[in-house]
């Protein structure tokens, strides 16, 4: 039997969020709807989830001593990592001491870098993946490109939202691709994965929930990327019966190996009836923001339920839907959004503005959401709304 305490009382159920971006913000809101006390942590002040949490702290989460001291001070019932750049060895140590890491410290440690999860998927679980090599220096990088061929995909082993990722299309860009990967790593310069290019019809995120009563799958989400960063997503993505069955098999196999409870974003490439594993995140996925409007329970609500041991009897899709990321480039600490009346004029259209106070280069500041009678109609609707938005830096 699950018993939840009330926030800000001696018997409160406490969750500490490690990473406080826009996805974490939605998780905080869903936890607070269930009366949970939430502490949000990030490396910079006033991050989106910190703005809505009961308390917040700003530390380097790669500093194991600082992280351990904070967790021992707050003594949360659940520790919920929301980013990759965390001292995961400290989480392993704290889990062994009795703290509850969501979904598990092992899952957080393996998925924080692409090497751990790729070796688990391809070498231990024998899941279909692209060809790949890991490299530590420019000479080995050149050799890997020679072996895998051009085009190929270059990624830091630890990064998110497309940072440091590129598709190498010419040998003339070798140095540029290497330098970009070195600059984009969440923990600084270092090891890189070079992946053989996969020919695919489309990419999907299969959100997979491990909960008290088993494993459940959301309707597959299609998405479009630019420079490794999500720009649009839609649900459901049409798939053959065979491809969907293979995708669910892959997702169940990898999430079972990682263990614990919570939502996982399993990314895959699909070509006809064939499915190739790409990556997995043990947390809500940015492409899954479409579920804020497409489903009765969003990925964030499902994550909260799973963490707390609450039932998930079924997952209902309300209608086809789409999302479009609001991405800006420039420099400002006083961003404003205009024409919102026009943006929200059409029925079943919504917007989420993340509350990120500063732009210095390229940053995702919000998302536009819409439902319609088909995915194509929903994509057209979010594009129309996006075109009306006036962003002032």
Curated annotation (Swiss-Prot):
N(1)-(5-phospho-beta-D-ribosyl)glycinamide binds at residues 22-23, 82, 286, 356, 363-364. It catalyses: N(1)-(5-phospho-beta-D-ribosyl)glycinamide + formate + ATP = N(2)-formyl-N(1)-(5-phospho-beta-D-ribosyl)glycinamide + ADP + phosphate + H(+). Pfam families: ATP-grasp (PF02222), PurT_C (PF21244), RS_preATP-grasp-like (PF22660). Its EC number is 6.3.1.21. Transmembrane segments: none annotated. One of its GO terms (cellular component) is cytosol. Residues 119-308 form the ATP-grasp domain. NCBIfam families: PRK09288.1, purT. Belongs to the PurK/PurT family. This is Formate-dependent phosphoribosylglycinamide formyltransferase. It comes from Histophilus somni (strain 129Pt). The gene is purT.
